[in-house]
Each structure stands twice: as structure tokens, then as C-alpha cells.
């Protein structure tokens, strides 16, 4: 996960010509779109999320002077994750140069993907079959306690479907 700080030049929205602006929100918006495009176009099935965006001074009549945002990149393969991080850094550098907005990118933390143990997963599949339950393999890019446990001991997880596939939502429901 990364914190990104985009600095522009706050200025009057009505009197500052477009070609003279250093709009931090425009630069941040380009980062948001670049993050989405990276994940969609990258081979495999990585995910990328901009989950927080803070605009300053956050006023309708002022060209935004700074924006703070977070970027969360995830994949089950650490090589793919490293490629995404390198691509993010390139995109941020390019966008900063094109918009004239200085951009600082700071790593907040890095979590290596942890694979479930084959033996544990086989036991889960066997138990589901014995009970006549359907099952499928679902790689998880979420950070669970199991991720840390799996670094020391054999680990596996059981997921049950929520209605509509929703998670981390007030509408999440599982029965």
C-alpha cells in the first residue's frame, strides 16, 4: 500500500486560465485512472484500489492545491506485485512531469502473498465432498489473519458466498 501526495498550485478557479493551472486534483485523477488501467491490462488477475482521496482546500472556487491519496495493489503472485509497483512508480513520474505537479509516493507497508497449504486445502475439499457440498478454488488477495499464520504453519481458508458477492458493505449478507 502506498500514500501519494500530489502538490499543485491553489489559485482562483474563475481567473486562472486552464493552460496556466497546476491542478493537483487533475494529476491525482490521472493517477486514479492509471491505477485502474494497470490492473485491468496486466496479465493475470491483480487488483488495484484508490481507497482514499483528500483534496485541499476542497473549495468550489479554488484550483486544488494538494491531494493525498492511497493506492492498494494486490496479487497472489509476488513477481506480478513487483511489476505493478514498478509500473505505478513509472506512471506517477510520468503524470507528475506532464502536469507540472510534484508527486511523492511513499510505501506504507508491503505484504507478501501467502499460499494455502495443499494438504489443508485437500482436507477442506474432502470434507465438503463428504457433506455433499459444492466447492471451488478461490485465490484470496485479501489480508486475513490466515496470511500471517500461513507463514509459520499450514493454513487454508473456507469462504462462503455472500448474496450478490458483496463484502465490506452494509448490504453484505450470508446465510
What residue ranges belong to the model's regions?
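Midchain, well-structured core segments that form catalytic/ion-binding scaffolds
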Residues: 1-79
Amino acid at each position: 500500500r502506498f500514500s501519494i501526495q500530489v502538490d499543485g498550485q491553489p489559485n482562483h478557479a474563475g481567473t486562472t486560465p486552464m493552460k496556466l493551472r497546476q491542478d493537483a486534483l487533475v494529476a491525482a485523477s490521472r493517477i486514479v485512472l492509471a491505477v485502474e488501467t494497470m490492473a485491468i491490462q496486466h496479465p493475470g488477475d491483480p487488483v488495484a484500489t484508490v481507497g482514499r482521496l483528500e483534496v485541499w482546500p476542497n473549495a468550489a472556487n479554488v484550483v486544488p492545491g494538494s491531494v493525498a491519496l492511497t493506492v492498494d495493489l494486490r496479487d497472489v503472485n509476488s513477481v506480478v506485485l513487483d511489476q505493478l509497483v514498478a509500473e505505478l512508480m513509472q506512471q506517477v513520474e510520468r503524470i507528475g512531469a506532464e502536469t507540472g505537479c510534484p508527486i511523492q509516493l511513499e510505501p506504507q507497508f508491503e505484504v507478501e502473498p501467502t499460499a494455502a497449504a495443499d494438504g489443508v486445502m485437500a482436507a477442506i475439499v474432502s470434507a465438503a465432498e463428504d457433506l455433499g457440498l459444492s466447492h471451488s478454488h478461490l485465490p484470496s488477495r485479501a489480508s486475513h489473519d490466515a496470511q500471517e499464520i500461513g507463514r509459520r504453519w499450514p493454513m487454508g481458508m473456507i469462504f462462503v458466498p455472500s448474496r450478490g458477492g458483496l463484502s465490506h458493505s452494509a448490504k453484505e449478507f450470508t446465510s
